[in-house]
Amino acid sequence: MRAKSAIFSRTSLSLCSARLLASSQWVPSSSRNSSAISSRLNPSRCADFTNFTRTTSASP
């Protein structure tokens, strides 16, 4: 179970960095998406997301 959660958090982290890259290269058509994804993308927000997924996947 621990390995699965590690893989899951790693996937979410790569998703986060991919989103960072994507948002710096193109602007989403929906302004709501752009504000949500790219509120001048705080790394802390990415960290919060990975922490959230780690805690939820770690819980039984």
UniProtKB/Swiss-Prot annotation:
Keywords: Mercuric resistance, Plasmid, Transposable element. One of its GO terms (biological process) is response to mercury ion. Part of the mercury resistance operon (mer). This is Putative mercuric resistance protein. It comes from Shigella flexneri. The lineage of its organism: Bacteria, Pseudomonadati, Pseudomonadota, Gammaproteobacteria, Enterobacterales.
